Every structure is written in structure tokens, then in C-alpha cells.
A protein has these predicted regions:
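Short coil/turn segments at secondary-structure boundaries
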Residues: 2-3, 15, 23-26, 49-53, ...
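Short "lid" loop at the C-terminus of a central beta-strand within the Rossmann-like core
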Residues: 43-44, 110-111, 142-147
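Class I SAM-dependent methyltransferase SAM/SAH-binding core
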Residues: 3-87
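A short glycine-rich, Lys/Arg-flanked "PGG" loop and its adjoining helix->strand segment in the class I
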Residues: 94-98, 111, 118-136
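Short mixed-charge
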Residues: 56-92, 158-186
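SAM-dependent methyltransferase
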Residues: 140, 144-225, 230-234
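Local beta-strand N-terminus motif with an aromatic residue
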Residues: 100-102
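A conserved beta-strand element that flanks and buttresses the S-adenosyl-L-methionine
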Residues: 105
Length: 234
């Protein structure tokens, strides 16, 4: 991670165990900010440990959350007695997340929260609780409306696919929903959730189920939590 202003602290959360590999890669780099990596379901409350408990429940492994709950107590400065083993953790971690973060980044994951409205709102509640006033949320995902329109115009109305110059598949998107309209109106929020697509990316080598993101609706719901879209000069 490089930027003009040094990063003072990084909290990295992912529901998958791949976060442990990311932690190792970070540890092996020479320029690394103070960091904490955790396996956590960010569609559940982060601060109170629900996200950790959800992972423990899903993977049937209590050890996944025991250490992480202690780390949460430390970084959110909850006045709890910590085990002796934690005494060597640098003091700068204590309470470092209590006042929130300047930037929250969600790369190629926003679409998963559009499974249903409760899942999305639970995630946005995490953003609201952890982003400082004046801070930024940055996210990356497909434009759901563009994907919807391209699937409508596809020869079989169901599949989009791109191949490279050697005929190897680069990506594919397969429609799994039945909806014929993805237009946002404030009265039809419920109908825009759960619009499933199967996505294959050659760089990952697997197919994952994702959900179309209607940006108009997303912006509207984010505004309820005091987030406003910002156009940055690049």
C-alpha cells in the first residue's frame, strides 16, 4: 500500500480465509502500516462482534473468533482485561478504531450485500458506525443496470462472454433472475434486490454468484445514513 500520506492503521476484513494469505503477503512487504487482519462477515455488526460470531458459526470453528474478539476489544478501546499474550502488541493499537476511519474501501464485494435489503442495510450500518465524519467510502462493482441491459441485448438473453485473442475465456456473466425491469423507483426497492448472476473471471478461475447493483437505489439508501456521492478531480 503506497500513498502520499502514510497510512497510520489498516483494518482488513474478509469473510473468507483468504484474508490470512493477504495478512502473510502484507507481513512480508517492507513498507507496511500497522495492520490487523480478521475473518469477519461484514454484513453483520463489526463493532459488537456479530460479524466474527457469524464466521465462527458458518465455519464451525470457535478459534476463528476468540483472538479476533480480543483484538476488537483492544482497537475499539473497550475496557476489558486482556490476556498476557496480548501485552506485546504495540500500544498504538489500543483504541485506534474508536474514532472511526478516514477511508473505508470495499473492492469487488459491494454486490454481495445486494442479496436482500436487510443484508445491505446491515453493511451500511457498519459504514456509518466506522467512517469518520468527513471520511470516504470507496467501492467497486459492476454497474447493475449496464449488465442488465447487455443481457437483454445478448443473443440468448442469458449469457455474456468475452474471449481473448487465443480463444480463452476472459469472463462470463450468466443471468439467474427472472425480472424484466431494473428501473429504480422509491416504491420498488424490494424488487431490485436478489437479482442473481453467476460471474466467472479467468484471473480467479472460479464462478461466483453475485447480485446486480442498482446505483440509483444504492445512493438513495446511502443518503439515509448521511453519505453523499463525491466527484473527485483526477
Amino acid at each position: 500500500l503506497r500513498c502520499k500520506k502514510p497510512i497510520s492503521f489498516l483494518l482488513a476484513l474478509d469473510i473468507h480465509a483468504d484474508v490470512n494469505k493477504a495478512a502473510k503477503r502484507m507481513y512480508l512487504t517492507s513498507h507496511r502500516p500497522p495492520s490487523v487482519f480478521m475473518q469477519c462477515d461484514t454484513s453483520r455488526n463489526i463493532k459488537n462482534g456479530e460479524g466474527l460470531s457469524a464466521v465462527e458459526e458458518a465455519f464451525k470453528d470457535e478459534s476463528l473468533s476468540v483472538r479476533n474478539k480480543l483484538l476488537l476489544d483492544m482497537i475499539y478501546d473497550r475496557k476489558k482485561k486482556l490476556p498476557k499474550a496480548f501485552s506485546k502488541i504495540p500500544p498504538l493499537y489500543k483504541g485506534i478504531a474508536k474514532k472511526g476511519f478516514d477511508i473505508i474501501s470495499s473492492q469487488f464485494s459491494v454486490h454481495y450485500y445486494f442479496k436482500d435489503e436487510l443484508t445491505l442495510r446491515s453493511y451500511i450500518q457498519n459504514l456509518d458506525e466506522n467512517c469518520k465524519a468527513g471520511g470516504y467510502f470507496i467501492g467497486t462493482c459492476y454497474d447493475g443496470m449496464k449488465v442488465f441491459q447487455q443481457l437483454q441485448n445478448a443473443p440468448d438473453k442469458t449469457n455474456l462472454e468475452m474471449e481473448d485473442e487465443f480463444g480463452q475465456k476472459v469472463y462470463s456473466i450468466t443471468k439467474k433472475y427472472d425480472s424484466e425491469d431494473f428501473t429504480y423507483k422509491q416504491t420498488n426497492k424490494e424488487a431490485l434486490f436478489g437479482q442473481e448472476i453467476d460471474v466467472y473471471m479467468s484471473s480467479i478461475g472460479q464462478t461466483f454468484t453475485e447480485y446486480l447493483v442498482n446505483f440509483e437505489m444504492f445512493i438513495d439508501i446511502m443518503k439515509e445514513y448521511n453519505f453523499e456521492p463525491v466527484r473527485l478531480e483526477v
